[in-house]
Amino acid sequence: MSGREKIEAAFSLEGTREIPAVICYEGIYIRDHWAQLTTSPWWHPYVPNVELQMAWHREVIAKTGQDWFALPGFYSLEDRESITIEARPEGVFRRDKRTGAVERLVEPRVGGWTALGEVESIRPTELAETTEEIDALIPVPAAFDPGRRTLNGQNDLAFALLREYGDYLFPIRHVSSPLWICYSLWGFEGMMSMIATRPNLVAHACERSLTLGIRAVQEAAACGAAGIWIEECLTDMISPEAFASLNVPFVRRLVEEIRSLGLKSIYYYCGDPAGKWEQLLSVGADALSLEESKKGFLIDVEDVVERVNGRCAVLGNLDAIELLERGSEEELRAEIARQVAAGRRNGSRFIMSLGSPVTPGTTVERVRLYCDLVHELGAE
């Protein structure tokens, strides 16, 4: 079976004969392991040239060995006519001849830290406190034109990757859940305060955010994606009642849109699912993905499978730090075998994955070993 066939089978009621191997957030993995993964210079993800982009994508796909890949966006044809990347002794610059603007590109930092080594978090100086302010910050997109990005060339890189890999790897894109998007509106403290004191305003923000999520899903379908990864963070910190009213209905509608377009949905819920299991399953996603045990909570894949009981596919949650990065090969093999066995008890509706992104300290060879072991141990 190809990787795509394995994943498609894992979503089916019959399950898959061969367990697929994936990592979550391959963009983080690529950023943190660029020099190990490709011979291309660090600025090539910015170049307005499809073949140069394809060159580093080919190297990454060949070295990683997983069964899916993320479909990127790209410059329009007009942008490609006007934008150049210039590597100079003093740095790398992006020039736009339409405006004369010159932007210095900064090499991405391992771990995603700022130049000062700080974590980047959102702390707005003023909070949006009215529906009008929210509407101004989250404008509703114009009517969707499914052919626009194809005609203007923004899908060209995605189409090139699909021509080369789409028959045997499963193409995905990422969206955020509507409530999680509220973090970008209010920051952590503001989001939590609004959920507690202004739930009607939060619901309005979620309604607006849902339009952005639906548009992202429509664009993903138009460029050839087969699956959507729905990311959600911080919602383990709110009550089950707030979760039921401010999160579940909006994620359910996002899932329904994904299904209506013929795509599969993967709901990645970050944090402790205690007290919210049935709500998580009630959104109707095609698959559920959870973190590994950490931060004081326990998520055992065997317990996940018992709770899901075949109602949807389950993604594995291999520990990205203690096992993938630091464990022995024997420990890694044993945990993959244990999780695969648990997945078989979910009717083989199972995709082996990690609970969190690959860490900067994990080698490329180790990630390839993980994928190879899954393919070995996941074969019937």
Describe the role of every protein-language-model region.
Residues 32, 36-79:
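Segments that shape or occlude catalytic/ligand-binding pockets
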Residues 5, 23, 29, 75, ...:
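Compositionally biased, intrinsically disordered low-complexity regions
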Residues 60-63, 82-87, 160-164:
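Short, charge-rich binding segments
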Residues 1-35, 42-43, 124-380:
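Active-site loop segments of alpha/beta catalytic cores
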Residues 62-69, 97-103, 108-109, 136-137, ...:
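Bulky hydrophobic/aromatic packing residues
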Residues 53-57, 88, 154-157:
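Generic hydrophobic, aliphatic-rich segments that mediate packing or membrane embedding
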Residues 29-32, 69-71, 77-87, 103, ...:
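Short active-site-adjacent helix-start/loop capping segments
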Residues 77-140, 168:
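A contiguous, low-structure linker/loop signature
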